[in-house]
Amino acid sequence: MSDDNQTKLEAADIQALLAVLPHRYPFLLIDRIVDIDGDVSATGIKNVTINEPHFTGHFPENPIMPGVLIVEAMAQTAGAISLLQRKTGRPGVVYFMTIDNAKFRRPVVPGDRLLLYVKKIKQRANISKYECVAEVDGVKVAEAEVAAMISVADENL
């Protein structure tokens, strides 16, 4: 328990993610978040399946998850923990602002379980920057720094 007598959120299932993120199929790219430490860090989980629509064209004979979708999954993980920790009842939207230092180290393919580690490295007003690493079976497959802004109508952030 935290000092304000509220239960500390340690994980978020798909229903919790659907409650805070505006993304839906086929663009909701995380299935669950675990190891949540406030809005500071967490681990997102993406189970990669052959049924995802991008595999029909990327690439038909050798399906590989597009790198841009791996970065988007990282950003969704960071955005979700920011929204899950909000103290107000007002809905918020997280806008992806920047991608820096993105590197892709190995392909992600159907059957992989993508672990998305995000850690806040900077906060200024309603803008946060996160260091992100994606791994499959303990091997780093991608990394990036992403920045995002929470926007809420009629709220001073």
Curated annotation (Swiss-Prot):
<comment type="similarity">
    <text>Belongs to the thioester dehydratase family. FabZ subfamily.</text>
</comment>
<feature type="active site">
    <location>
        <position position="58"/>
    </location>
</feature>
<protein>
    <recommendedName>
        <fullName>3-hydroxyacyl-[acyl-carrier-protein] dehydratase FabZ</fullName>
        <ecNumber>4.2.1.59</ecNumber>
    </recommendedName>
</protein>
<dbReference type="GO" id="GO:0016020">
    <property type="term" value="C:membrane"/>
</dbReference>
<dbReference type="InterPro" id="IPR013114">
    <property type="entry name" value="FabA_FabZ"/>
</dbReference>
<keyword id="KW-0456">Lyase</keyword>
<keyword id="KW-0963">Cytoplasm</keyword>
<keyword id="KW-0441">Lipid A biosynthesis</keyword>
<keyword id="KW-0444">Lipid biosynthesis</keyword>
<dbReference type="GO" id="GO:0009245">
    <property type="term" value="P:lipid A biosynthetic process"/>
</dbReference>
<dbReference type="Pfam" id="PF07977">
    <property type="entry name" value="FabA"/>
</dbReference>
<dbReference type="GO" id="GO:0005737">
    <property type="term" value="C:cytoplasm"/>
</dbReference>
<comment type="function">
    <text>Involved in unsaturated fatty acids biosynthesis. Catalyzes the dehydration of short chain beta-hydroxyacyl-ACPs and long chain saturated and unsaturated beta-hydroxyacyl-ACPs.</text>
</comment>
<keyword id="KW-0443">Lipid metabolism</keyword>
<dbReference type="GO" id="GO:0019171">
    <property type="term" value="F:(3R)-hydroxyacyl-[acyl-carrier-protein] dehydratase activity"/>
</dbReference>
<dbReference type="InterPro" id="IPR010084">
    <property type="entry name" value="FabZ"/>
</dbReference>
<dbReference type="GO" id="GO:0006633">
    <property type="term" value="P:fatty acid biosynthetic process"/>
</dbReference>
<dbReference type="InterPro" id="IPR029069">
    <property type="entry name" value="HotDog_dom_sf"/>
</dbReference>
